[in-house]
Amino acid sequence: MTTSATEKALEDRAKSLHKKEKKASAKAAAAAGASASTSLEGSPSPASPAKKDKKDKKDKKDKKRSADDADADDDEKAAKKRRKEEKKAKKAAAKSGAATSLESTPAASPAPAASSSASAASFTPTNPAAARAFVESHNITIEAPEESNERPPLPMVDFRELDGKVDAAVKKTLDSQGFSTPTPIQACCWPVLLQNKDVVGIAETGSGKTFAFGLPALQHLVTKHKVLDSGKKKAKGAQVNVLVIAPTRELAIQTEENMAKLGKSMGIGMICLYGGVSKQEQVRLLNQSPPVRIVVGTPGRVLDMARDGSLDLSGVTYLVLDEADRMLDKGFEPDIRAIIGMCKSREEGRHTSMFSATWPPAVRGLAESFMNGPVRVTVGSDELSANRRVEQTVEVLADGYAKERRLNDFLRSVNAQRSKDKILIFALYKKEAQRIEQTLRRGGFKVSGIHGDLGQNERIASLERFKSAETPLLVATDVAARGLDIPNVEHVVNYTFPLTIEDYVHRIGRTGRGGKTGKSLTFFTEMDKAHAGELIRVLKDADQKVPDALTKFPTTIKKKTHSSYGDHFKELVPGKAKKITFDDD
């Protein structure tokens, strides 16, 4: 019995009872006299004990029948759910490449030609032994969702394994990039995403995440949205199909540039949306030809343009949240939830990818809210730890005045005035960054800066000069500590220690990327003593030398849990003052 039928039956019984109660009330009123009255709901005055007992039995019988009907309805729903799960398990076991219905695989596309589109079948590597060795050598963990009985797919360790699984144009574009082998995060995410499944990728910035979700995004467009490429608009704003959200303008620009290397040769329009520049110009670019299918942007600007009607997110079926932990740290969770609510739902076939450097409870909660049984891929550890390929040097200085002299000594020791080696220098505040930049420039060094006081165009220009080694020194605040993938940074200098140990780990992670080694130099003073214990732990975990002077500071670590930062979070907000009162003598 369906829910609507059950409700109708209950309503009919209620009407019948109401009529009988009115008749009984009339008889009771006649017997008791004019003083008898009924309640507002039409309940009768007390009748004879025999009639009352008979009525109570009937009421109990009707209630029991209604409960039985409801239980039967619940049993029917449970049986239907079991049949659906059994059907899904059989299809997975059969490993059929045929297209399935929307109920079983929401984003399955009409079966395309075998030569030009991805197969929906489970991926099997040509050399399983090599794939397992790849997983072990790179310390990779691949976990299938708990509710699934399927084994997680092994990685694609060779680009040739993409043949026949992606469109020929997508494969040709990838081949033109000149890569020799996939990175660990790419090798593990491609088999999952090309099967139209959700994925959570835990890996450090600079590990190749953009191509990990970028290549499947292009394949998704070629198969699922090929019919939409006529460019005819059905909504007020520009309708897009792939949306990538990043926490900062710099990371969004960088991600769009990397995706453009793959997509623009295929004629797929894409745009980067971020604040600090003209919104009118971005609206104009959104409506250009070829029509924009991919948007990469920051949460604030994307939500702003979606709300004012410039951007239509109702057609988004491929969603990527990049640096998810960083976005939650910056307080973007409400914006992210609002944006996801404007996209297609999971039931309508939206696929979601989430990438993060760590896996704190807040990120897990976001994944549980919006993802559909994701496969979790972890490269390395999901705990915050320093890159072992970075040689960490910590110098304990008497005071802050010694930093400037020591920085000059270091730069001259590595011949920074003539060398093209890239050195990234971190300051804590923008005023401090400006002062360091000016001092170095007066000393004859080629240096650029990136901090909050610079306009967007100035920041982009500084980054480009640093990337090209035109100015091999870059002084930055923590705005550049996460997300930016600047290749071939040889040295990182922490002129001032950051506010948290997490920021320290992310700062030194700017070097030693892509399998290369790097070096970091950190100046530590009495002002930073609260971080001594945490810094010693990070150094020991990475098998680095701990200077004797550092161990002289208090090393107690208050282990607290924070929704975004995880353990070892130092609460900087002072507690509420306590009022002390004394008893009168």
UniProtKB/Swiss-Prot annotation:
Q: What is the name attached to this protein's record?
A: ATP-dependent RNA helicase DBP3
Q: What is known of its domains?
A: The Q motif is unique to and characteristic of the DEAD box family of RNA helicases and controls ATP binding and hydrolysis.
Q: Which organism is it from?
A: Mycosarcoma maydis
Places the protein is found: Nucleus, Nucleolus
- What UniProt keywords are attached to this protein's entry? ATP-binding, Helicase, Hydrolase, Nucleotide-binding, Nucleus, Ribosome biogenesis, RNA-binding, rRNA processing
Instruction: Locate the transmembrane regions by residue number.
Output: none
* Any one of the GO BP annotations: endonucleolytic cleavage in ITS1 upstream of 5.8S rRNA from tricistronic rRNA transcript (SSU-rRNA, 5.8S rRNA, LSU-rRNA)
Per the record, where are the segments of Low complexity compositional bias?
26-43, 94-124
| Top-level taxon of the source organism | Eukaryota
Q: Record's GO cellular component, any one?
A: preribosome, large subunit precursor
Which CDD domains does the entry mention?
Answer: DEADc, SF2_C_DEAD
**What EC number(s) does this enzyme carry?**
3.6.4.13
Q: What SUPFAM superfamilies is this protein classified in?
A: P-loop containing nucleoside triphosphate hydrolases (SSF52540)
Q: Domain named Helicase ATP-binding: which ranges? A: 190-377
Its recorded reaction(s) are:
ATP + H2O = ADP + phosphate + H(+)
According to the UniProt entry, which residue ranges have a biased composition of type Basic residues? 52-64, 79-93
